[in-house]
Amino acid sequence: RNRGEERPGAFPARFCMYMGKPAVLDEISKSRDQLEEMEKYVVPDETGILYETRWSFVERDYQEVPWKTYLAEMERSDSLAAVREKLQEYLKKREKSGGLRKDFTSRFFEEMIQNIYVYLKESNIVFGQIFDSEEYETKRREAVLSVVGAHAFIDYLFDVLEGQKKNES
């Protein structure tokens, strides 16, 4: 990451600490298994610290996102700011409900990108014309690995889309 890109108090996406809970000797292997599961599946929040005590509260079920509604709103509006804000709020709500899982963020961003492809196709714009592939791939990878990266990826996508929309005007 470049200096100044991080949110105040946030660690870069590459940092994460896993904090177990105190355990008696007989339960250490169970605690280790929990920490390994967390490392595999959970997305670090802005602090970069994942606590074993909170892991059980992370939602495992994928909640459908109203993509058709968002796509229709993007197509009829001169500004994409409202959809951007709704997506950011959706992620914040998921974070507050216990955290994010990597499988959730992967699916969320796959679906979001598919809807952006549809949005651009209806405007006769090719995705690769407006997005730099190297920058896009870097930000997409970080989006799945940290909450900070997830929010930054949404901002990146919508900044580029807003810029394209202004160029069309």
Stretch-by-stretch model annotation:
Residues 1-169:
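Cytosolic nucleotide-utilizing catalytic cores of signal-transduction proteins
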